[in-house]
Amino acid sequence: MELRAWVLLWRLVLLQSSAVLLSSGPSGPATSDRSVVSESTVSWAAGARAVLRCQSPRMVWTQDRLHDRQRVVHWDLSGSKAGGPARRLVDMYSTGEQRVGEQRLGEQRVGEQRVYEPRDRGRLLLPPSAFHDGNFSLFIRAVEETDEGLYTCNLHHHYCHLYESLAVSLEVTDDPRAAGAHWDGEKEVLAVERGAPALLTCVNRAHVWTDRHLEEAQQVVHWDRQPPGVPHDRADRLLDLYASGERRAYGPPFLRDRVAVEADAFARGDFSLLIDPVEPADEGTYSCHLHHHYCGLHERRVFHLRVTEPAARPPPPPRDSPGNGSSHSGAPGPGARDPTLTRGRSVINVIVPEGRAHFFQQLGYVLATLLLFILLLITVVLATRQRRRGGYEYSNKKSKSKGKDINMAEFAVASGDQSLYRSEDIRLDYKNNILKERAEVAHSLPPAKNIDLDKEFRKEYCK
């Protein structure tokens, strides 16, 4: 009955207290893990088994029927007037097995607290619904002189690897007018009258501490691939992995059957991507995205994959010939090969049928070449005919012009010369000189008379 009265008093003090309620947000790592945590360039030879390492212990998931988050809150006191190191005052787990140090305390009910000092039992209280409403405030029924010091409210989340702490300074005074709370720039300072109840506030209503969600529905890992030259926002999804065991495969067909992630990835926190065998077409940027919405974890690891040529294999050692004395005569063993059988590399010729568009393209090239040749031939023929026709007309014009411009004087001179030429050509061979002289007289023509036709024409014109 007395305990219920004190609990009722504690609730009234909680509602009417004028202390400042400080609520801390999500932890620093939880908000800063949205950025890229690592970026590296890896090279693998073509045909090898490529491994892109993506590991995180914060993604390890252990299934529990009670949905135990392994959360604990504990209050510590340091700097008290009694002196000595900091000491644990009280702690409380969300549910399940409770421990102090390495000692097992057994099973406790949800909201059950553990008080370490016998003098503090029944005097220090934590709200039983702390892990449901996020109120982890410490209530002290009657403040004593030894209670003065620096109190720290510590929240641990072993599953999400989170740790948060809040400090409150408690001062005990005999003056009721000095009682109150203020902020000194780093922490809350609470002054309480001796013998009066005190409420040290510690409030954190983040869902990770209030058990409002199930982690198996909010824990996912996925791999993305960016071909060379493709931005991050247009990456192709390769794999989706869920803590519930569901898996989804995407990506191009030539890569989908060669990528895999181990089946126990969530049990070990190892989500490395295996590509077996890796090919030159697999080059690009691969991203490993780790999302734990319950714990507030968002990480991305980037890998730039380069595929190199496979290393040249060393030539096989020469086989021992039968005549060098290194081989022994006898029947061949069961694993010996027949030397008459030679094994060569098999070559497969693949004939890819050409499309109809390719056929018409080649036909167009042939027709265009033929048309160009015909046009060139016609041009040559026309040019030749035009040249011949022009030469014939030129010769006709030249002959006509020569026939019109005949000089009569030159004609006369030419006629006289022609007669002389003819007389000189006559060759007579006679037996005596008398006959020769007679023949010359008979055949000799009268001397040519030069007539100037121009003068004759002028004479006729003057008459």
UniProtKB/Swiss-Prot annotation:
Q: Which ranges make up the Cytoplasmic topological domains here?
A: 384-463
| Entries under InterPro entries matching the protein | Ig-like_dom, Ig-like_dom_sf, Ig-like_fold, Ig_sub, Ig_V-set, MXRA8
Record the organism.
Bos taurus (Bovine)
Q: What do we know about how this protein assembles, alone or with others?
A: Homodimer in cis. Does not appear to form trans-homodimers. Interacts with ITGB3; the interaction inhibits ITGAV:ITGB3 heterodimer formation.
Motif RGD: list the residue ranges. Answer: 268-270
> Which spans does this entry mark as compositional bias, Low complexity?
321-335
Carbohydrate-modified residues are: 135, 324
Location of the region described as Disordered in the Swiss-Prot/TrEMBL record? 309-341
Assign the protein's first listed, main location to one coarse class: membrane
Q: Which residues lie on this side of the membrane: Extracellular?
A: 20-362
Localization per record: Cell membrane; Cell junction, Tight junction; Cytoplasm; Cell projection, Cilium membrane
UniProt signal peptide: 1-19
Q: Mind listing the UniProt keywords for this protein, alphabetically?
A: Cell adhesion, Cell junction, Cell membrane, Cell projection, Cytoplasm, Disulfide bond, Glycoprotein, Immunoglobulin domain, Membrane, Nucleus, Phosphoprotein, Repeat, Signal, Tight junction, Transmembrane, Transmembrane helix
Q: Which cysteines are joined by disulfide bonds?
A: 54-153, 202-288
Ranges for domain Ig-like V-type come to: 29-173, 176-308
The protein, known as: Matrix remodeling-associated protein 8
Residue numbers marked as site, Cleavage: 346-347
